[in-house]
UniProtKB/Swiss-Prot annotation:
It is found in: Cytoplasm. It comes from Pseudomonas syringae pv. syringae (strain B728a). GO terms for molecular function: 3'-nucleotidase activity; 5'-nucleotidase activity; exopolyphosphatase activity; metal ion binding; nucleotide binding. Its cofactor is a divalent metal cation. A divalent metal cation binds at residues 8-9, 39, 91. This is 5'-nucleotidase SurE. Belongs to the SurE nucleotidase family. Gene3D superfamilies: Survival protein SurE-like phosphatase/nucleotidase.
Amino acid sequence: MRILISNDDGVNAPGLVALHAALADYADCVVIAPDQDKSGASSSLTLDRPLHPHTLENGFISVNGTPTDCVHLGIHGLLERQPDMVVSGINLGANLGDDVLYSGTVAAALEGRFLQRPSFAFSFLSRQPDNLATAAHYARLLVEAHEQLDLPPRTVLNVNIPNLPLEHIRGIQLTRLGHRARAAAPIRVVDPRGRAGYWIAAAGDVEDGGAGTDFHAVVQGYVSITPLQLDRTCQDGFSSLNTWLEGLR
């Protein structure tokens, strides 16, 4: 089996190196990742310039683009032999609840949705790699066990691992996405020439983090695993929308 590994923290990120090391003796692993940090890139594609893959000394391939660019190239022609599945991460920082809408880590996994096997997005609840071995352990465990899964086509599994030593993890919980409150207002700054600029501020506080959510699971010391799908159609809105449209005719 061949696994395409990518991330949004960049090709030299410790989480990517740890993920590759965890899977290297399980499958033929190919790493294609952004040449710099692309956190928050979501599913964006680069359309205003060419992409230039560059093979590094360790065999990893860096690309001057987004995580989605990297997986797109890997699946659609850059590799002589197409991968069987996509595994993204290990992100240093959580991707919980609404975070998945912005996450380049999750987006890389979503780009692998056309392959025959589920894609995985792994995130670690710390910006520091102290307990990264815990995340690598669960990445290997879940990827190796995927062959026993019977999931709908194009399913992506979003996995978040607490920042704990392995022996302190309480288990794995199947979860739904929680929700955050509205994000903080952008931070206004003024440069030396008097021009105003803005920094995107922190994500909103957890608003829906009760039992059953990914937020709740990781706080309780569990690895959370949330199945995601591409179809964002709001079926619950069909009835009221049909009534509304009837009134417009």
